[in-house]
Amino acid sequence: APTPATLNGLTIFAPNDEAFKATGVPDLSKLSNAPMVSLLQYHAAAR
C-alpha cells in the first residue's frame, strides 16, 4: 500500500513501480514537464 508523506501542507502518495508501469510510460524520466505534472497531480493532495 502507498505510504503518504507530508511536506509543507502537501501529502504525496507514492505508488509502487508496478503502478507507474501501468501508466504505459516505459521511462518516467523521459516525460516532458506537462505530462509529468499531469501524472503527479493524481498523487498529491493539499492538507
Curated annotation (Swiss-Prot):
This is Fasciclin-like arabinogalactan protein. Gene3D superfamilies: FAS1 domain. Residues 1-47 form the FAS1 domain. It comes from the Eukaryota. InterPro entries: FAS1_dom_sf, FAS1_domain. Pfam families: Fasciclin. May be a cell surface adhesion protein. It comes from Jatropha curcas (Barbados nut). Belongs to the fasciclin-like AGP family.
